[in-house]
Design a protein with these regions (language model features):
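Iron-sulfur-cluster electron-transfer modules
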Residues: 2-188
Length: 190
């Protein structure tokens, strides 16, 4: 990310200062390549550690949006976005596969014997895609579930009705898909 910001500074200097950045969404590949933009994991560590308080991630995501609008996404990014759109998660797993870990740990699932009314519970535990599908994420979700049980908190998970928050789509630069997934969440009052 530091190199991208440095290249953006050089681009602005070579093209009349910061006003050049206002009119250009993305400098040509001579300045910043798509490979450089997608090499960033968008973990935000650079933003947290930057002594100059530069928002590198915001600039990178904005340039990714431009690439997406121009139809320049390829490979893994395209497949991930397709899976998000069709299956509601970045891996393309079926929604019914979100809960096997919960059954093993006796975690109540809304609409599956736990009742259909979210108001019956103190907490609706949002596991997210990682917590639902990834083995390491399932371990974390199981541990949190155990802590909630020990604390006497009445909780449930959404199970198959839970979908992705859309964060991977936003980070890849696909704002429209992010908005669509976010709208789905707002319809279920989250």
């Amino acid at each position: 990310p530091r190199d991208i910001v440095t290249k953006l500074r050089h681009f602005a200097t070579a093209n009349g200062g910061t006003d050049a950045m206002k009119n250009e969404y993305l400098p040509s590949e001579d300045w910043v390549t798509p490979e450089e933009l997608y090499a960033c994991t968008t973990c935000s560590a650079c933003v947290e550690q930057c002594p100059l308080f530069i928002d590198q991630m915001g600039k990178i995501i904005e340039m990714r949006r431009f690439l997406t609008m121009e139809g320049q996404l390829t490979g893994t990014a395209v497949r991930t976005l397709q899976k998000l759109g069709s299956h509601g998660n970045p891996w393309g797993f079926e929604s019914g596969d979100r809960t096997p870990w919960a059954k093993e740990n006796e975690v109540p699932v809304l609409g599956n014997g736990a009742g259909n009314n979210a108001e019956e519970f103190d907490v609706i535990f949002w596991t997210g895609c990682f917590g639902a599908y990834d083995p390491r994420g399932q371990e974390v979700a199981s541990t949190i579930s155990e802590l909630l049980k020990e604390a006497g908190v009445k909780f449930a998970i959404m199970g198959p009705s839970e979908t992705c928050t859309g964060d991977p789509a936003r980070r890849l630069g696909e704002e429209a898909l992010f908005q669509e997934l976010a709208m789905t969440l707002s319809l279920i009052h989250i």
